């Protein structure tokens, strides 16, 4: 069946995404940062919008996400929330704003009050206490495993994670621990496609992949990559504007290719 992107008719919730996973229906995620793009995403049927700390590199000109501040995140979350009333909106907690449980509570509250419906944090089992605390207090959580860009200095660069059997098993163990603690979604970034599929099958919560293969429940790309604005695009990305006449067309093409299983192709996987 050919998928045709249509505007979202109802507000997307965590339950919407759980049902889509159960029905084996892929959902669309786009990382973007302003009201006009947020409104366009809603019109193009994008179920999930992520305001990522990737804005440090895509919007602010930093060479990593490490310098991004809470104030910068709040500014862009508020802008996106004003432009989109139906997609599920996820807001990132930036570098070192969730190092302790108390700090996590304070900053997650700010993200939610800015208009997000869920907060995202990078890290493995060390986050379990913070995830459980937020979940028990009614704040939905999106976890993030694999290549976690805030740890780029520890990794020695933006490198694929989970290639060894030991690394892969650790990612699976962390994913299960985060789910048990109450995480509602999980982003998997830059891991082998086979591992992305294994993690997805092991969890009851939906997974969102970026460079994690075609076996995840959803895909996410940064709007800059979708529109070909990145000077040195990552392997997992694709310029969809080349196959469309305008920006809405590029978003619709991205959505259609994800829904139909065309994207990511072999050339976008590890």
From Swiss-Prot:
Q: What is its main location?
A: cytoplasm
Where does this polypeptide localize?
Answer: Cytoplasm
Q: Which GO terms describe its cellular component?
A: cytoplasm
Cite the Pfam families for this sequence.
Pantoate_transf
Which cofactors? Mg(2+)
GO biological process, any: pantothenate biosynthetic process
Q: What is its EC number?
A: 2.1.2.11
Catalytic positions are 189 (proton acceptor)
Annotated residues for binding of Mg(2+): 53, 92, 122
Q: Which reaction does it catalyse?
A: 3-methyl-2-oxobutanoate + (6R)-5,10-methylene-5,6,7,8-tetrahydrofolate + H2O = 2-dehydropantoate + (6S)-5,6,7,8-tetrahydrofolate
Q: Which UniProt keywords apply?
A: Cytoplasm, Magnesium, Metal-binding, Pantothenate biosynthesis, Transferase
Q: Name one GO molecular function term.
A: magnesium ion binding
Quote the cofactor binding remark: Binds 1 Mg(2+) ion per subunit.
User: What are the binding positions for 3-methyl-2-oxobutanoate in this chain?
Assistant: 53-54, 92, 120
Q: Does the keyword Nucleotide-binding apply?
A: no
Its annotated pathway reads: Cofactor biosynthesis; (R)-pantothenate biosynthesis; (R)-pantoate from 3-methyl-2-oxobutanoate: step 1/2
Q: What does this protein do?
A: Catalyzes the reversible reaction in which hydroxymethyl group from 5,10-methylenetetrahydrofolate is transferred onto alpha-ketoisovalerate to form ketopantoate.
NCBIfam families to which the protein is assigned, alphabetical: panB, PRK00311.1
Query: What family is this?
Result: Belongs to the PanB family.
Q: Assembly and partners?
A: Homodecamer; pentamer of dimers.
Output this protein's name: 3-methyl-2-oxobutanoate hydroxymethyltransferase
Protein species of origin? Saccharophagus degradans (strain 2-40 / ATCC 43961 / DSM 17024)
């Amino acid at each position: 069946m050919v998928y045709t992107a249509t505007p979202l008719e109802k507000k997307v919730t965590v339950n919407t995404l759980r049902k889509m996973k159960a029905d084996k229906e892929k959902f669309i995620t786009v990382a973007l940062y302003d009201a006009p793009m947020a409104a366009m995403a809603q019109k193009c049927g994008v179920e999930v919008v992520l305001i990522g700390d990737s804005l440090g590199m895509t919007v602010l000109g930093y060479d990593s996400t490490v310098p991004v501040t809470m104030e910068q995140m709040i500014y862009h979350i508020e802008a996106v929330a004003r432009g989109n009333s139906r997609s599920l909106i996820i807001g990132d907690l930036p570098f070192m704003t969730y190092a302790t449980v108390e700090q996590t509570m304070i900053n997650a509250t700010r993200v939610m009050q800015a208009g997000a419906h869920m907060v995202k944090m990078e890290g493995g089992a060390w986050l379990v206490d913070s995830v459980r605390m937020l979940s028990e207090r009614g704040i939905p959580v999106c976890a993030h495993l694999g290549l976690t860009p805030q740890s780029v200095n520890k990794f020695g660069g933006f490198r694929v994670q989970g290639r060894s059997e030991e690394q892969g098993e650790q990612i699976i163990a962390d994913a299960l621990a985060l789910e048990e603690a109450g995480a509602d979604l999980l982003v998997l970034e830059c891991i082998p496609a086979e591992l992305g599929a294994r993690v997805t099958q092991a969890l009851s919560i939906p997974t969102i992949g970026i460079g994690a293969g075609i076996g995840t429940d959803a895909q996410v790309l940064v709007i800059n990559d979708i529109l070909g604005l990145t000077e040195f695009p990552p392997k997992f990305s694709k310029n969809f504007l080349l196959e469309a006449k305008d920006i809405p067309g590029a978003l619709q093409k991205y959505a259609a290719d994800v829904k139909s299983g065309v994207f990511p192709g072999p050339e976008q996987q590890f």
